Amino acid sequence: MDNEKGLLIVLSGPSGVGKGTVRKKIFDDPSTSYKYSISMTTRDKRQGEVDGVDYFFKAKSEFEELIKQDQFIEYAEYVGNYYGTPVQYVKDTMDRGYDVFLEIEVEGAKQVRKKFPDALFIFLAPPSLDHLRERLVGRGTESSEKIQSRVHEARKEVEMMNLYDYVVVNDEVELAKQRIQSIVEAEHLKRERIEAKYRKMILEAKK
């Protein structure tokens, strides 16, 4: 591990687009070296989810106390539930040279952009809104009213993709994973990220 500061990778998109599925695919890849920043939420745990692995599940009162203590990079209330990203883990991990991967809601990503303007923002988009609705129905975890609410929110969120650096369509999970990995690799090769290191090398060579 060199002294280059880690990159903050923000993956966001509408509810039901498959953010969690794509994230799991990325982290199941043995070549992945990112550190996953686990978000905190007050929503109910879904089947198969593990506290402290997929999310930190908290009561609403606990979450609101942490907000008062300014313990989040971002937080948002979405369809009646809070979601947030604990701040200290992210800063410490990046300072150690690791890339940190955030999987968050669109509203939360807007807050991260203000605090971490140099982060890498990737919008995960559905092939279509009809496809998104089918995914939500297929979950079998929410009422038709809740699904309609999420699809309505998704329309507004798709219109906000101009706030992101890249858009990846989740038409196939493996392809989405590969596209995201390629984007991160290219981001590390940007001149702005490596120029300072080479300037320092040149100055030291002149001594």
Swiss-Prot record:
Q: Which residues bind ATP?
A: 13-20
Classification via Gene3D superfamilies: Guanylate Kinase phosphate binding domain, P-loop containing nucleotide triphosphate hydrolases
Which keywords does this chain's UniProt record carry? ATP-binding, Cytoplasm, Kinase, Nucleotide-binding, Transferase
**EC number assigned by the record:** 2.7.4.8
Q: Which cell locations does it reside in?
A: Cytoplasm
The residue range of the signal peptide is none
Reaction equations catalysed: GMP + ATP = GDP + ADP
A UniProt-annotated Pfam family: Guanylate_kin
Q: Identify the residues that the record assigns to the Guanylate kinase-like domain, covering every copy.
A: 6-185
| Lipoprotein listed as a keyword | no
Record-level GO cellular component terms: cytosol
- GO molecular-function term, one example from the UniProt record: ATP binding
The UniProt entry's sequence similarity note says: Belongs to the guanylate kinase family.
Question: What function is annotated for this protein?
Answer: Essential for recycling GMP and indirectly, cGMP.
Q: Which HAMAP family match?
A: Guanylate_kinase (MF_00328)
Spell out the PANTHER family in the cross-references: GUANYLATE KINASE, GUANYLATE KINASE-RELATED
Name of the protein in question: Guanylate kinase
Gene this chain is encoded by: gmk
